[in-house]
């Protein structure tokens, strides 16, 4: 009798995706982050659901409802901090997942890569709206500053901002709609992830060498299920350690001051995972130019497959490209640090130089270096 998992209409989908899936025998731990992102999404949806049961999206009561969750709800503090720090873990896994894709040439799977870029935008939008919900000082002013950027769009900008606000400033209407979108977007992300996977399984996974692994495949279960479970346990260990020992390590003290439209915080800044993009935005003195640079800093990922000039897929055997890749990583870390600094000398010029280097590396230096490496190998 044929195994039920191979014949049942629903179970055979799971079987072909997670059990009998042929996987390359040499994929490293860098391939764990896809499953970790799935776990992060589940954690966020579950903790978010329980938070939504107690949260009120009204400007008068939003801040006190979050306080109520932390003080009066059973393990409310744990749920709230798991959700807040879970977002940080989500972005750590996301950045490592994208970095792995760039290093090993996974972007050559065009459909999978483009849906991944869409997913990145969706997660960033969700995180931004979630940052507004506690209605602290940084929530209010962050929402005001970031939504105001849309006014840089010629002709329709001002109308668009007021349409998003639902009035003439960030107020109750804005908070209510942000809560609605923050609630629905994770399910859209889950649906997109459900499209991301079949496109990946259509081609099969890439591997560190960048060569075809058709000649040497192994079943996903038990080899990679065990490997993924280890990754999940390490993720949970890191998340619980952060939540239980230092829950506010990655947050901003201004979150604990109720929103006050009459008092601007000295330094308005987003959460740490947006600081690199925020630094790029601030480095351009022109408003429209800054907004374009901000969008392009992420959208540039969609261009990467078209900038691939090397005859080899992976960077595993390309030392010069490896050097540039790690310079890019260092540059992004520098931009992240710069985004959290006040707008004054020397941070202004440093931010501008780091922003120029970011675009130069991806658009010019990496493609030229790849051609140089081809030449060295007489290809």
UniProtKB/Swiss-Prot annotation:
Cofactor note: Binds 2 heme b groups non-covalently.
Record keywords, A-Z: Electron transport, Heme, Iron, Membrane, Metal-binding, Mitochondrion, Mitochondrion inner membrane, Respiratory chain, Transmembrane, Transmembrane helix, Transport, Ubiquinone
Domain of life: Eukaryota
One GO MF term: ubiquinol-cytochrome-c reductase activity
Entry binding sites for heme b b566: 97, 196
Cofactor list: heme b
GO biological process per UniProt: mitochondrial electron transport, ubiquinol to cytochrome c
GO cellular component: mitochondrial inner membrane; respiratory chain complex III
Name of the protein: Cytochrome b
Organism of this sequence: Sorex minutissimus
Gene name of the record: MT-CYB
């Amino acid at each position: 009798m044929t195994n039920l998992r191979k014949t049942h209409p629903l179970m055979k989908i799971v079987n072909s995706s997670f059990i009998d899936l042929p996987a390359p025998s040499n994929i490293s731990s860098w391939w764990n982050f896809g499953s970790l992102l799935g776990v992060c999404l589940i954690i966020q949806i579950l903790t978010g659901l329980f938070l939504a049961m107690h949260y009120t999206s009204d400007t008068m009561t939003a801040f006190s409802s979050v306080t109520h969750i932390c003080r009066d709800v059973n393990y409310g503090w744990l749920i709230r901090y798991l959700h807040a720090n879970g977002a940080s873990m989500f972005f750590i896994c996301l950045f490592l997942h994208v970095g792995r894709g760039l290093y090993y040439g996974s972007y050559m799977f065009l459909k999978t890569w483009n849906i991944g870029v869409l997913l990145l935008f969706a997660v960033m939008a969700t995180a931004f709206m979630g940052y507004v919900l506690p209605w602290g000082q940084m929530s209010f002013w962050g929402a005001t500053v970031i939504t105001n950027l849309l006014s840089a769009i010629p002709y329709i900008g001002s109308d668009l901002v007021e349409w998003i606000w639902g009035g003439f400033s960030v107020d109750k209407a804005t908070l209510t709609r942000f809560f609605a979108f923050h609630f629905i977007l994770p399910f859209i992300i889950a649906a997109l992830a459900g499209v991301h996977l079949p496109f990946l399984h259509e081609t099969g996974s890439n591997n560190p060498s960048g060569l075809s692994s058709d000649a040497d495949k192994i079943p996903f279960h038990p080899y990679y299920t065990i490997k993924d479970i280890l990754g999940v346990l390490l993720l949970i260990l890191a998340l619980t350690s952060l939540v239980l020992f230092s829950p506010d390590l990655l947050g901003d003290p201004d979150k604990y001051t109720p929103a006050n439209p009459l008092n601007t915080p000295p330094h308005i800044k987003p959460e740490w995972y947006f600081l690199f993009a925020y630094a790029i935005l601030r480095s351009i003195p022109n408003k429209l130019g800054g907004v374009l640079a901000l969008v392009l800093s992420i959208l540039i990922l969609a261009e990467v497959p078209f900038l691939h000039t090397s005859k080899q897929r992976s960077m595993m055997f390309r030392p010069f490209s490896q050097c540039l890749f790690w310079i890019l990583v260092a540059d992004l870390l520098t931009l992240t640090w710069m985004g959290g600094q006040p707008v004054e000398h020397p941070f202004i010029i440093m931010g501008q130089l780091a922003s120029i280097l970011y675009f130069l590396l991806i658009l010019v230096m990496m493609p030229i270096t790849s051609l140089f490496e081809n030449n060295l190998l007489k290809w």
